[in-house]
Amino acid sequence: MGQKVHPIGIRLGVVKRHNANWYANPKQYAEYLLKDLQVREFLTKKLKNAMVSNILIERPSGAAKVTISTARPGIVIGKKGEDIEKLQRELTNIMGVPAQVSINEIDRPDLDARLVAEAIASQLEKRVMFRRAMKRAVQNTMRAGAKGIKVEVSGRLGGAEIARTEWYREGRVPLHTLRADIDYATMRAETTYGTIGVKVWIFRGEILGGMKQVMNPAPAEERPAKRGRGRGEGQERRGRRGDRAADKGE
């Protein structure tokens, strides 16, 4: 029976970054890893409604830097930055070194696999039909500019007695192409019938520049303003047509 390798794990160092960037002595490695897990668990619970996608942990000498990627930065920052200052103090207590928190805003949450999986899981918990939730997620992601998406749900779908797996795919999802920018995430929906697993793969295009392009992304180009027919322009055109009709009548 064929199995799929983790789409992000196989691309680490090729077109994907690690979620933790630090070096440690063999004696300190277990301690650092445990604190990283504690930080991620703490932030996941505390920022449950902030649509957090990724947490990057870095350890410069004698300090720590935590970068939170979220679609709702206002919830993390709080009024006048009070919440983020409190968050920094709590992370400092957990990690044992001064911690700095920075926010990375996600402009298009429909292209983020974790946020899409969270949205599907949330709908399943609210008793939305799983096919409708899957189709809605696929449509929104493709409309946002994705090259392809695959969504898979498994469990007691619709309250059935026998668990099964169903999936839906649109566009291309090339899992064997290492330069392909594949975002992957899993989530669990706790329903009254049991746990339903959600998996999402999103293909956002190819990264031809490798890790250099990932570490130093090019600035987004400004979109040209749309030319719409304004009220005055439309009136002017109608006026010209009316003048031509009047000339023919004469």
From Swiss-Prot:
Keywords: Ribonucleoprotein, Ribosomal protein, RNA-binding, rRNA-binding
A cellular component annotation (GO) from this entry: cytosolic small ribosomal subunit
InterPro entries: KH_dom, KH_dom-like_a/b, KH_dom_type_2, KH_sf_prok-type, Ribosomal_S3_C_sf, Ribosomal_uS3_bac-typ, Ribosomal_uS3_C, Ribosomal_uS3_CS
GO molecular function, one term: mRNA binding
SMART domains: KH
Pfam families: KH_2 (PF07650), Ribosomal_S3_C (PF00189)
Example GO biological process: translation
Keyword Nuclease (UniProt): no
Region annotation Disordered: where it falls in the sequence: 215-250
Chain intervals with Basic and acidic residues compositional bias: 220-250
Domain KH type-2 intervals: 39-107
Domain of life, source organism: Bacteria
HAMAP family listed in its UniProt record: Ribosomal_uS3_B
UniProt similarity note: Belongs to the universal ribosomal protein uS3 family.
Assembly and interaction partners: Part of the 30S ribosomal subunit. Forms a tight complex with proteins S10 and S14.
Function, as annotated: Binds the lower part of the 30S subunit head. Binds mRNA in the 70S ribosome, positioning it for translation.
Protein name per Swiss-Prot or TrEMBL: Small ribosomal subunit protein uS3
Organism: Acinetobacter baumannii (strain ATCC 17978 / DSM 105126 / CIP 53.77 / LMG 1025 / NCDC KC755 / 5377)
Phylogenetic placement of the source organism: Bacteria, Pseudomonadati, Pseudomonadota, Gammaproteobacteria, Moraxellales
Gene: rpsC
